[in-house]
Swiss-Prot record:
Matching HAMAP family: Heptose_epimerase
Domain notes: Contains a large N-terminal NADP-binding domain, and a smaller C-terminal substrate-binding domain.
Gene encoding the protein: hldD
Gene3D superfamilies cross-referenced by the UniProt entry: NAD(P)-binding Rossmann-like Domain, UDP-galactose 4-epimerase, domain 1
UniProt xrefs under PANTHER family: ADP-L-GLYCERO-D-MANNO-HEPTOSE-6-EPIMERASE, NUCLEOSIDE-DIPHOSPHATE-SUGAR EPIMERASE
E.C. numbers: 5.1.3.20
Protein name as annotated: ADP-L-glycero-D-manno-heptose-6-epimerase
Cofactors that this protein relies on: NADP(+)
Length: 332
């Protein structure tokens, strides 16, 4: 029997594969699209039994090749570019593909865990897994939002089947180097500081001072742990926020990233005020392209996740970014 991870060469998917390996689990079929071939690097230190292109995998399950052979699908594959404007592509890639997998898993009684997104909330100031707080600002968010609505219907119709959706907030950490502009601000800050000796953040917007817009930043190691918790508990279903449960500023991320780099040089840590005074942090104009499409504040309500029994602490920005910078120093 196999465990399938889609998006396995991507950011979160490869961290899940590695977390499974650390448990001694290697009967993993990795599914992805390696058109952007550099992602293969995320799987070099992982153990899997097979790799399939995303389209080949769908064709094979529809042809019955995997009937009775899969225990669980962890569906992380998607286009996660919030700036993508091709709605037809987004809906086919994110929504329709997910629908095929969902219905196959229900038919086969296979555990189905999938990536949703905090983008489903849009500009809502309340981040609770309820329909009245949802209102995506872009087609990426809509593709995730619509699938979540179908999942709610399927859960009501199939109460004994496991379907779990994770509304990821701002995930950062190892194995995201292929993501380009969609990589985390921590990754961009690391690269900026290494190249230019300073980091850049957006000027104030939405009523927030420079760099003080706040997001729920969640370390990818915590994301992988939550996925495996639900894999261990097939009796638990639902759509769950997956963040740290706390909002922290982009300034906090910049301070942690710079100080992580300074630590590697045996230099002392600096405060935000010291970074500004020494010209190590500067602010750039808020992009026109993001106006009306930007979440200036997010903070996951973890009440439902905690009620489901997941009680491990989530890393703070200071803890997680410090670990991440150490990883980047070794691997990039």
């Amino acid at each position: 029997m196999y465990i399938v991870v889609t998006g396995a060469a991507g950011f979160i998917g490869s961290n899940i594969v590695k977390a499974l390996n650390e448990r001694g689990i290697t009967n993993i079929i990795a599914v992805d699209n390696l058109t952007k071939a550099d992602k293969f690097k995320n799987l070099i230190d992982c153990d899997i039994v097979d790799y399939l292109d995303k389209n080949d995998f769908i064709e094979r399950i529809q042809a019955g090749h995997f009937d009775g052979e899969i225990d669980a699908i962890l569906h992380e594959g998607a286009c996660s570019d919030t700036m993508e404007t091709d709605g037809r592509y987004m809906m086919e890639n994110n929504y329709r593909y997910s629908m095929i997998l969902l219905d196959w898993c229900l038919d086969q009684d296979v555990q189905f865990l999938y990536a949703s997104s905090a983008a489903t909330y849009g500009s809502s100031g309340t981040f609770k897994e309820e329909r009245q707080y949802e209102g995506p600002l872009n087609v990426y968010g809509y593709s995730k939002f619509l699938f979540d609505q179908i999942v709610r219907q399927r859960l009501a119709q199939n109460p004994s089947s496991q379907i779990v959706g994770f509304r990821y907030f701002n995930v950062y950490g190892p194995r995201e180097t292929h993501k380009g502009r969609m990589a985390s601000v921590a990754f961009h800050n690391f690269n900026q500081f290494r190249a230019d000796g300073k980091v850049k953040l957006f000027e104030g917007s939405h009523g927030y001072p420079d760099g003080d817009q706040q997001r729920d930043f969640v370390f990818v190691g915590d994301v992988a742990k939550v996925n495996l918790f639900f894999l261990d508990h097939p009796e638990k279903s639902g759509i769950f926020n997956l963040g740290s449960g706390r909002a922290q500023s982009f300034n906090d991320v910049a301070v942690a990233a710079v100080n992580g780099c300074r630590k590697a040089r045996s230099e002392s840590a600096l405060s935000l005020e010291e970074l500004r005074a020494q010209g190590l942090l500067e602010y750039v104009a808020f992009p026109e392209a993001l106006k009306g499409k930007y979440q200036a504040f997010t903070q996951a309500d973890l009440g439902k996740l905690r009620a489901a029994g997941y009680d491990a602490p989530m890393a703070t920005v200071e803890e997680g970014v410090s670990q991440y910078i150490e990883w980047l120093q070794r691997n990039v």
